[in-house]
């Protein structure tokens, strides 16, 4: 399986509900480093997994929807703990929707087998969501 990864970052504010979260129950900020890895079984006619520039732009567009927001005030996350794990899945879903809409060019999204999204809270802690695209 071939893969191509792009990375970016975003900043949010949020809080959690539940004693398991300790002091993170209070409003706090987070800066996430994000990696999106696109995978396919064979390379395209140009020898690529996908256009790296389009992949980077697509990731940036998805993260711009979240950047500098207080997620506690976002209607789409009402009643949810926006944990690192949850956000990895949410970014995956948003990227997958853009892939289905053709954001990486004609036929590229259809050729991709899977996508993996990694959110890094720090150099020693991260979460990921991975899923098939076909």
Feature locations, PLM:
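Charge-rich, low-complexity N-terminal segments
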Residues: 1-134
